[in-house]
C-alpha cells in the first residue's frame, strides 16, 4: 500500500503507511524499506525534522547498500541545512561528495563549497570547486553551479577578470535548459 501511494505521489498518505509498516514489520528488509520510504516522503514533503529523524534511523541499519547509505547521508545533510545547522551537514557532505559520479555526490560537492563560501571561507570553497572541476561529473548542472560559485568567489576577491573568464566560458559551453543562463547573465551584467 505504501509503495503504491508513493508511486502515485501521495506522499502524505505514503508517509503514514510507511510509519505503520515500520511498526508492524517483522523482517529486516521490510523495516529498512519502511524507514527508506519514510525518509523519502519526509524529504519530498519538505519536512526537514522528520527527514533528519528518518535518515538517522535508517543509518542505524547494519546492512545498508552504499547507495542507500549515500542517499540517507544526503537527506540528512540537506535537512541540517534546512534547519540552519550547516556545521552538522559538513561531515555528510564531505563523505558523499567524494563520488561526484552520482547526482547526490555532485550536489554535495557544490553544497560543501557553498557552505564554505557562505561562511566567508573562500580558500576552502575554491579548493573544493577546483577539485570538483578537476575530477568532473556527468551531472553538468551541478558543475555549472560550481563554476558560477567560483566566479562569485573571484568577484568577492576583486578578481573580476578571472570571474568573467569563467562565466563567459560557461556561457559558451553550457547547453542545459534551466536557470544557469540567467545566473550567468546576472553576474556578467554587473
Place the predicted regions along the sequence by residue.
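Acidic, polar-rich low-complexity tracts and alpha-helical solenoid repeat scaffolds
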Residues: 1-190
Amino acid at each position: 500500500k505504501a509503495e503504491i501511494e508513493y508511486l502515485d505521489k501521495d506522499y502524505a498518505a505514503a508517509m503514514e503507511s510507511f510509519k505503520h509498516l515500520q511498526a508492524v514489520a517483522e523482517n529486516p528488509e521490510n523495516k529498512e524499506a519502511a524507514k527508506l520510504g519514510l525518509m523519502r516522503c519526509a524529504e519530498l514533503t519538505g519536512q526537514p525534522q522528520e527527514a533528519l529523524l528518518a535518515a538517522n534511523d535508517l543509518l542505524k541499519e547494519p546492512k545498508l547498500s552504499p547507495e542507500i547509505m549515500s542517499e540517507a547521508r544526503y537527506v540528512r545533510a540537506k535537512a541540517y541545512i534546512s534547519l540552519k545547522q550547516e556545521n552538522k551537514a559538513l561531515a555528510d557532505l564531505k563523505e558523499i561528495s567524494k563520488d561526484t559520479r552520482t547526482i547526490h555526490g555532485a550536489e554535495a560537492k557544490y553544497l560543501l563549497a557553498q557552505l564554505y563560501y557562505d561562511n566567508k571561507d573562500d580558500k576552502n570553497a575554491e579548493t573544493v570547486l577546483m577539485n570538483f572541476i578537476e575530477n568532473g561529473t556527468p551531472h553538468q548542472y551541478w558543475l555549472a553551479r560550481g563554476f558560477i560559485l567560483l566566479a562569485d568567489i573571484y568577484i568577492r576577491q576583486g578578481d573580476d577578470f578571472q570571474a568573467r573568464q569563467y562565466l563567459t566560458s560557461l556561457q559558451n559551453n553550457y547547453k542545459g535548459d534551466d536557470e544557469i543562463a540567467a545566473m550567468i547573465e546576472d553576474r556578467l551584467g554587473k
